[in-house]
């Protein structure tokens, strides 16, 4: 079995800055504080290798698997994941549902259904729907006792969401959620933005705190 990555080996933004592996953005992002940098991590790797409490899958409305990261997560989890997903009756765009992780090294899989960019943008709903995926996933994580969550780059694959816009929306949603209810957000120790492609990693680097 390929090696997995424990949470202790996923660097926070604070560590990335102090070790000069990350350069602060030229323009200060809104709502920046040290708590964000201590809680948020950025890593480029295969999300199926992360030993976080939960990982967030870029699912489709059927929840029955697909291409890209969705297919990779289903393959790594094994057929039992599909069997559980078949009982969930799908999921609406902008929402999320949670399952066991089966053969994955994490504890839970949160299946978030991001918007198809072109269609959602025509309706003026693309940002709201994508941000809803992140906040709903965090709420599910808290409700299920998951203290660390790793997000894939939702909607940036075949759904066509530009990486820069997606990263800005994702980081804005996460920071807004952290600030909205300090008592509730304290139940999450780490939020990881996990990218597989360089274009997504570079986009996160432009918009992180």
For each of these PLM feature ranges, what is it?
Residues 117-209:
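Phosphate/ribose-phosphate-bearing ligand recognition and processing surfaces
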């Amino acid at each position: 079995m390929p090696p997995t990555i424990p949470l202790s080996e996923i660097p926070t933004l604070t560590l990335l800055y102090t070790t000069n592996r990350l350069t602060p953005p030229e323009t200060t992002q809104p709502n920046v504080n040290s708590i964000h940098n201590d809680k948020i991590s950025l890593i480029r790797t295969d999300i199926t290798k992360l030993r976080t409490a939960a990982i967030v899958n870029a699912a489709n409305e059927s929840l029955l698997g697909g291409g890209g990261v969705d297919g990779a997560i289903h393959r790594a989890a094994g057929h039992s994941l599909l069997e559980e997903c078949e009982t969930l009756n799908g999921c609406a765009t902008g929402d999320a549902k949670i399952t066991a992780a089966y053969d994955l090294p994490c504890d839970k899989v949160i299946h978030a259904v991001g918007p198809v960019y072109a269609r959602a943008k025509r309706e003026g709903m693309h940002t709201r729907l994508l941000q809803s995926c992140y906040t709903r996933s965090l709420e599910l994580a808290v409700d299920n006792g998951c203290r660390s969550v790793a997000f894939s780059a939702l909607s940036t694959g075949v759904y066509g969401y530009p990486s820069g816009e997606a990263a800005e929306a994702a980081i804005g949603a996460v920071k807004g959620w952290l600030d909205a209810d300090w008592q509730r957000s304290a139940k999450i120790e780490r939020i990881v933005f996990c990218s597989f492609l360089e274009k997504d990693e570079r986009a996160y680097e432009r918009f992180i705190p």
